[in-house]
Amino acid sequence: MVETALIFDANNLMYRAYHRFNSFTDVSGRPTSAIYGVPFVVEAQVRKFQPDLVIAVFDGARSKHRLKICPDYKGSRVQKLDFDKEDFLRQKEEVMEGLYNLGVSVVHNPDQEADDMIYSVVKLLQKQRVGTIIIISSDKDFNQLATTKDVVIYNPHSQEKITVNTCKHFKGYEAKQTVDYLTLVGDDSDNIKGYPLVGEKRAQQFLEKYGSIKAFLRGSEISSVVSKNALQKIYKKNHFLISLRAYHLKYMRDVKINWYKNQPFPTPNKSLFENYCGAFTLKSFLKDKGFYETFKSLSQRSIRSRKNNLS
């Protein structure tokens, strides 16, 4: 039985690494910020949590269904001035290959968002009765998945562990209220507008009082903060944009888990990884003897713990 699985929101890691290590280049001068940064972070978290299975999920296209409702959905990410999309995509291909050579299970569907695929992977692992599922991401959207004891959202930067028991402490709302909270305050990173003049405190107070937006809309009480008619319209739009469960239920056939090279359980290949390091001047990975051993040990744990293949 797989006791612990790590799921990496790989694009989230890539964006951070792309900017954090922006001075890194190979011998020809090509940027290698994400090529270096993503394996660096993944190895640190694998060493920290000692999982039996590691899955890195990469973003594809923005959801066509969400774009119909909100044409500017995630538009700000596309329009960043300090962002070289062509170079980012080049590095993304190399990162997927590098992680694969380390024995990391890589998921990528060019037509789907990572959030939706991560939701599907979580449901798959829960069906396989995996003991603990840890999602590595700083994206607050994933807090909505921490409604059962087996799911943990870990932010490697703040080091917060969001669970069904800790979400209220860290965020001021219950994990099950995440979608309603984001509906009220909006999400700037995704270009989703919330209810006018409702910020974090007002949203937390609203949810503390009413429990949920649905409960408020069904009740007879009138709020001085929000109008029921206006909130009803915003809720209908934002709930679909934000709720991974709602999207999954409506478009489940569209969300396919595509394993990189059709291999859900790749085997670490030291020779290929050394070639990867040589091609991109990643000498530190080769000098640190423990780096590759982290993934070799992961592979051994994975083989011992798996009884049924994921498909």
Could you say what each language-model-derived stretch is?
Residues 1-72:
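Non-catalytic, usually N-terminal nucleic-acid engagement modules in DNA/RNA processing proteins
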Residues 7, 52-59, 105-109, 132-136, ...:
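Short glycine-rich phosphate-binding loop at a beta-alpha junction
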Residues 33-37, 87, 113-114, 241, ...:
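Soluble or luminal CAZymes and related metallo-dependent hydrolases
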Residues 42-46, 99, 125, 277:
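Hydrophobic, Leu/Ile/Phe/Ala-enriched alpha-helical segments that form helix-helix packing faces
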Residues 49-50, 101-105, 150, 278, ...:
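Structural alpha-beta junctions
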